[in-house]
């Protein structure tokens, strides 16, 4: 390099390492309506001040790097940098605090959850100055959410397609999840749908294994759907899992489902990836297919209280990427605090506008403008005795999914489905009459079982079954 060139390059540039807080901690900053806002739970290494740790998160998830670079002078850092604009302590935790970070909208590609997460959480979680880091919540501004299609159809369109109103929808995951032949699998689907369920479901790891290839499963399940529809006069569906090893194979399976004339397909959105999920959601809207989403692998990301991402962030990301249903936990039998947190992200899935409410874990007011809503799915260890609580907690706009609670009935699959349908109809009728489901739930189920032998048998089998463990997800 010539002396003349060296002089020009060094004008206004001082090499070396400087504290992040000098550039990225800006408590005077007033957030803009177009900013993406993030709330991080930060656990810094001993000796690292909160302001420096919060600024480091803002820097490493936006424009910063470990040292000053001369190319900073070729752009406007003030326009593009993330800013840590507020820090608050976490009650009961001396070494943790919440850092609020604002990101300019120009940092993100339109309509790409993949790019949004690559920026915000892609690199910073391995930063040495932090012992742990958890993304608790995101505020998605309307200016960004309007660049997404979102759910293929949404709650109202799904109800119109199914012609089902005024109650939660009923589902069932076929068990055993692995090992059945396609024909026996289809038989179980038929029996459950004929008994009164609205949907049956592939489990998350049912793809295309040697014992049951996907095309055979799709054919036998379609036969079960159409036969049960003809017998009951109701529209039925089975969540055909289109998840595959490549996007091309996934779309091929969705195309085959459309050609069969079935109403709904399914995707494992975390293991499949957001790019694949968004592609499938676009295909589903264009071709009239509903899209059920399974959250397999979520606990790897959201289970730890001080590191990872809270599920409410994954739920918001799914609403952007696209899905008509998503699994959201059950609440039943857990602690009250977890109930409030779960209902917080259930509202974020369903409602158009959700106010900030820290008691439910909602850090920001979220306006979804015209983005369709997503039906939460309650699934996992539930049975007929849980029906009053589930109906009261989740309301009509939900899917209540009983796997073992249907297929475990002592008389078989169809009676198991009958028991669940009778229990649901009894709870909905009691609620509509003004009765208190939380207080009178057991009485309502017992009364209904007097005229339904299928329900009476189910009540006897599961009367002692409880899942009482402390909740991991607390405020």
Curated annotation (Swiss-Prot):
It catalyses: 2 (2R)-3-phosphoglycerate + 2 H(+) = D-ribulose 1,5-bisphosphate + CO2 + H2O; D-ribulose 1,5-bisphosphate + O2 = 2-phosphoglycolate + (2R)-3-phosphoglycerate + 2 H(+). PANTHER family: RIBULOSE BISPHOSPHATE CARBOXYLASE, RIBULOSE BISPHOSPHATE CARBOXYLASE LARGE CHAIN. Pfam families: RuBisCO_large (PF00016), RuBisCO_large_N (PF02788). It is found in: Plastid, Chloroplast. The gene is rbcL. Its main location: plastid. It comes from Vitis vinifera (Grape). RuBisCO catalyzes two reactions: the carboxylation of D-ribulose 1,5-bisphosphate, the primary event in carbon dioxide fixation, as well as the oxidative fragmentation of the pentose substrate in the photorespiration process. Both reactions occur simultaneously and in competition at the same active site. The active site is at 175 (proton acceptor), 294 (proton acceptor). Keywords: Acetylation, Calvin cycle, Carbon dioxide fixation, Chloroplast, Disulfide bond, Lyase, Magnesium, Metal-binding, Methylation, Monooxygenase, Oxidoreductase, Photorespiration, Photosynthesis, Plastid. The basic functional RuBisCO is composed of a large chain homodimer in a 'head-to-tail' conformation. In form I RuBisCO this homodimer is arranged in a barrel-like tetramer with the small subunits forming a tetrameric 'cap' on each end of the 'barrel'. The modification N-acetylproline is found at residue 3. It is an enzyme of class 4 (lyase). GO terms for cellular component: chloroplast. One of its GO terms (molecular function) is magnesium ion binding. Residues 1-2 form a propeptide. The record marks 334 as: Transition state stabilizer. GO terms for biological process: photorespiration; reductive pentose-phosphate cycle. PROSITE patterns: RUBISCO_LARGE (PS00157). The modification N6,N6,N6-trimethyllysine is found at residue 14. Its cofactor is Mg(2+). This is Ribulose bisphosphate carboxylase large chain.
